[in-house]
Amino acid sequence: MSAKNNIQDQLLNTARKDKLDLTIYLLNGVPLKGKVVSFDNFTIVLEQENKQSLVYKHAISTIIPAKIIKLYTEETKDAVQG
């Protein structure tokens, strides 16, 4: 899968750049709320009230942004341009 089609990176990068609030639910049901400071292939750094949490992606169940994030993949670009 190419970087252009990586939906999770698109969502996290847009949330980081736009400083959007996210709610991240862990597999055990615990919700974490905050803003994405940084992320890589395995982790997300989340900031809330001047505290940072390093969250491992394998522990995440769901990510819910505070507002809709428009994601574009090669398929949707082709459909729009097509």
Curated annotation (Swiss-Prot):
What is one term from the GO cellular component aspect held by the record? Answer: cytosol
Key words, A-Z: RNA-binding, Stress response
* Keyword RNA-binding listed: yes
Q: Which GO terms describe its molecular function?
A: RNA binding
- According to the entry, every stretch annotated as the Sm domain falls at 9-69
Task: Specify whether RNA-binding is a keyword of the entry.
Answer: yes
Write down the Pfam families for this protein, in alphabetical order.
Hfq
Sorted alphabetically, the Gene Ontology BP terms of this entry are: regulation of DNA-templated transcription; regulation of RNA stability; regulation of translation, ncRNA-mediated
PANTHER family assigned: RNA-BINDING PROTEIN HFQ (PTHR34772:SF1)
> Assembly and partners?
Homohexamer.
Q: What is this protein's function?
A: RNA chaperone that binds small regulatory RNA (sRNAs) and mRNAs to facilitate mRNA translational regulation in response to envelope stress, environmental stress and changes in metabolite concentrations. Also binds with high specificity to tRNAs.
Q: Which family does it belong to?
A: Belongs to the Hfq family.
Give the matching NCBIfam families. Answer: Hfq, PRK00395.1
What is the name attached to this protein's record?
A: RNA-binding protein Hfq
Q: Which organism is it from?
A: Leptospira borgpetersenii serovar Hardjo-bovis (strain JB197)
The gene name reads hfq
